[in-house]
Amino acid sequence: MGALIGEMIALSLMALALGMDAFSVALGMGLLRLRLRQIFYIGLTIGLFHIFMPLVGMAVGRFLSREFGSIATYAGGVLLLWLGGQMIVTSFQQEEGTSFLPHGAGLLFFAFSVSLDSFSVGLSLGIFGARTMATILLFGLFSTVLTWIGLLVGRHFRQWLGSYSEALGGSILLVFGLKLLFS
């Protein structure tokens, strides 16, 4: 029983760490003009990706973990750099609106980039034989809720920042992209 509790605590802490990463990125995304319905779907989509990606990672397991661990981190960094750059460029254009819209393919692209780190964690957990169902449910729950919180906090600050909010949001994504590339 003690081992089960210890594993659940460890998995919860990992889920919190991955969820905090999603929260940080969601702060930047929340600076866009988002409706509550969009916030709901963005959080839900990121949560689903945080279920799917570690599940795939756990299935791939030990053999590929060394090769894909660093590749996934670099790919996530490049994706966040691209998305952040797009947001910054768009903020300086005179058009009302944005080239990145958090729905459809853009939302899937964003959710994929945010959840790449959970793929790497899933690879590691697959090696150690962690409980699959507990892992993916905790990862999905934490990332969904923390994404919602990040989007709502970002949305609140958008009112204070006005037209500079999208550039700031893009800058936040750029910083996290650089962090992934150089850590």
From Swiss-Prot:
Principal location: membrane
Q: Can you provide one Gene Ontology molecular function annotated for this UniProt record?
A: manganese ion transmembrane transporter activity
- Example of a GO cellular component annotation carried by this entry: plasma membrane
Membrane topology designation? Multi-pass membrane protein
Which UniProt keywords are listed?
Cell membrane, Ion transport, Manganese, Membrane, Transmembrane, Transmembrane helix, Transport
Q: Where in the cell is it found?
A: Cell membrane
Q: Which InterPro entries match?
A: Mntp/YtaF, Put_MntP
Q: Where are the transmembrane segments?
A: 8-28, 39-59, 68-88, 108-128, 133-153, 162-182
Q: One Pfam match, by short name?
A: Mntp
Which family does this protein fall into? Answer: Belongs to the MntP (TC 9.B.29) family.
Biological role stated in the UniProt entry? Probably functions as a manganese efflux pump.
Q: What is this protein called?
A: Putative manganese efflux pump MntP
Q: Which gene encodes it?
A: mntP
